Amino acid sequence: CNFCALAFHQGRTVRSRSIESVVREAKLITEMPDFKGYIHDVGGPTANFRYGACKKQLTDGVCAGRKCLAPTPCKNLVADHSEYIELLRAVEALPKVKKVFIRSGIRFDYMLCDKSDAFFRKLVRDHVSGQLKVAPEHCDDRVLRLMGKPPFEVYEKFREKYFRLTRECGLEQYLVPYLMSSHPGSTLESAVNLALCLKRDGYAPEQVQDYYPTPGTPSTVMYYTGINPLDGKEVYVARDYHEKQLQRALLQYNRPQNYDLVVEALQKCGRTDLIG
């Protein structure tokens, strides 16, 4: 994502340990005296995206100025979870292991590119500890594009499928979406739309993140210059502390302590019809 610094300390090419290496470490964990039978997170920052995105990447390196998944998946992308399923099964098969969880890092857009549902079904059935954390970040497609994220309809498609498979498995599980306020491009109107989306879905986030710049990222360039370095166009930036407070409050509109801020934001946006 454009606001993420992971590529700077892990590299742009996704690299993974072998199944044998992960299993060896998991086995060491099972031999610890306080091990209770649970392996709590199998997968790196991209969890299910374990290897290079395409054959070209393996020989020529990553593409300049092109993302593998956003705004739309590259036609050369190879989306295959079969090796990841093999890894999960290998860890599950270890003596003393009761359950293997995937806590976060799932790339839901990559999952939807896989023509097979095998991993999706296995994830829902075997590897969610009540809640799965994913990162749609926003619902405004204009903001999402500046973030380097897929359109919101991709998350909605994932969300629908996740809950459908959960019901088919006879389980009660939830999604915890990571959300961000005040990213470059996000206006008060954008935050109001996100609040309406949360209300529609009946979701009240316990935590939200207000954007802050991290060195070297495209989003940081937008924040300091007001220009998108990827196309040279001007970008609105919420730098005023009070406006950032308003945007953040809208994402947690249901909290009594945010009431006055939410009312002020709605008045500024001409949406007094939403004041309750």
Question: What are the functions of these language-model segments?
Answer:
Residues R15-L28:
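Conserved S-adenosyl-L-methionine
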Residues C1-S18:
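Canonical Radical SAM [4Fe-4S] cluster-binding loop centered on the CxxxCxxC motif
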Residues V22, V134, V208, G270:
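Conserved, mostly hydrophobic/aromatic
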Residues G216-G276:
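Radical SAM enzyme core and accessory elements
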Residues Y203-T214:
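Glycine-rich phosphate-binding active-site loops on the catalytic face of alpha/beta enzymes
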Residues A118-F119, H183-R200:
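Catalytic cores of alpha/beta
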Residues G43-P45, Y212-T217:
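Short, solvent-exposed turn/loop segments enriched in Gly/Ser/Thr/Pro and often Arg
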Residues K27-V176, M180-P184:
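Conserved SAM/AdoMet-binding glycine-rich loop
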